[in-house]
Curated annotation (Swiss-Prot):
Complexes and interactors: Homotrimer.
Pathway: Isoprenoid biosynthesis; isopentenyl diphosphate biosynthesis via DXP pathway; isopentenyl diphosphate from 1-deoxy-D-xylulose 5-phosphate: step 4/6
Tree of life domain: Bacteria
Binding site for a divalent metal cation: D8, H10, H42
Free-text remark on how the cofactor is bound: Binds 1 divalent metal cation per subunit.
Organism for this UniProt entry: Pseudomonas putida (strain GB-1)
Reaction(s) catalysed by this chain's protein: 4-CDP-2-C-methyl-D-erythritol 2-phosphate = 2-C-methyl-D-erythritol 2,4-cyclic diphosphate + CMP
Binding annotation for 4-CDP-2-C-methyl-D-erythritol 2-phosphate: 8-10, 34-35, 56-58, 61-65, 100-106, 132-135, 139, 142
Entry EC number(s): 4.6.1.12
Stored PANTHER family: 2-C-METHYL-D-ERYTHRITOL 2,4-CYCLODIPHOSPHATE SYNTHASE, CHLOROPLASTIC (PTHR43181:SF1)
The protein's name in its UniProt record: 2-C-methyl-D-erythritol 2,4-cyclodiphosphate synthase
Keywords recorded for this protein, A-Z: Isoprene biosynthesis, Lyase, Metal-binding
Length: 157
């Protein structure tokens, strides 16, 4: 069994929605990114890649490569799952914590879990997503961006 940790941050920019866990959420800002900016799926991808000793998403999907401009992070996550499986691993479970002052995540978490489970090809009870604030402290508390911490457990396939 292997455990991986993922962490990602994206800064807010002009826009009127963000995408987290594959869910489009109305917001007063967007997220600045080369891809679609789905910080949750990026952190999960990094956790999976880390657990399999396969580097990180920057190695597999460099932000200097034009083919990944505006990329759908769900497609990137599915690709990560494919290469992790090719190395002989399957997902045991994943857990993620979204750190954001706004927008409120609670109304969207179940849909995020369902989409992530679909992309990972696992059962819903193998995926956990939760959210917290920093009580208005730090960059997330000042609503400058969003951060996500995640862990993944891989089991031999």
């Amino acid at each position: 069994m292997r455990i991986g940790h993922g962490y990602d941050v994206h800064r807010f920019c002009d826009g009127d929605f963000i995408t987290l866990g594959g869910v489009r959420i109305p917001h007063k800002y967007g997220l600045l990114a080369h891809s679609d900016g789905d910080v949750l799926l990026h952190a999960l991808s990094d956790a999976l890649l880390g657990a399999a000793a396969l580097g990180d998403i920057g190695k597999h999907f460099p932000d200097t490569d034009p083919q990944f401009k505006g990329a759908d992070s769900r497609a990137l996550l599915r690709h990560v799952v494919g290469i992790v499986r090719a190395k002989g691993w399957k997902v045991g479970n994943v857990d993620a914590t979204i750190v954001a002052q706004a927008p409120k995540m609670a109304p969207h978490i179940e849909t995020m879990r369902q989409l992530i489970a679909e992309d990972l090809q696992v059962e819903l009870d193998q995926v956990n997503v939760k959210a917290t604030t920093t009580e208005k402290l730090g960059f997330t508390g000042r609503e400058e961006g969003i951060a996500v911490h995640s862990v993944a457990l891989l089991l031999p396939a």
